[in-house]
Amino acid sequence: MALKEEFEEHAVKAKTLPESTSNENKLILYGLYKQSTVGPVDTGRPGMFSPRERAKWDAWKAVEGKSKEEAMGDYITKVKQLLEESA
């Protein structure tokens, strides 16, 4: 299976993660997903009155140095890990 196809499959699986998944892990997945699909951060950092959006932006910025392919691989690995932990 091609990396992009596997990534898309795991993006669907990520939506089945339990609500108990930590915010930290959700933010890691968000950052890797954005890096995989958009690439480097292309917006300014949200202000302090938007803490949720700011945390998401920070998670994306944290993985900015990864290639799209590397981010896809890391995303797949993280989703697999979280699914195993929740089983």
Curated annotation (Swiss-Prot):
Keyword ATP-binding: no
UniProt-listed GO biological process terms: fatty acid metabolic process
Keyword annotations from UniProtKB, A to Z: Lipid-binding, Transport
Keyword match Nucleotidyltransferase: no
Domain ACB as annotated: residue spans: 3-87
Annotated coiled-coil segments of the chain: none
Annotated an acyl-CoA binding sites: 30-34, 56, 75
InterPro entries assigned: Acyl-CoA-binding_prot_CS (IPR022408), Acyl-CoA-binding_protein (IPR000582), Acyl-CoA-binding_sf (IPR035984), FERM/acyl-CoA-bd_prot_sf (IPR014352)
Source organism, top-level taxon: Eukaryota
GO MF terms held by the record: fatty-acyl-CoA binding
Function statement: Binds medium- and long-chain acyl-CoA esters with very high affinity and may function as an intracellular carrier of acyl-CoA esters.
Family designation: Belongs to the ACBP family.
Protein name: Acyl-CoA-binding protein
Source organism (scientific name): Fritillaria agrestis (Stinkbells)
Biological classification of the source: Eukaryota, Viridiplantae, Streptophyta, Embryophyta, Tracheophyta
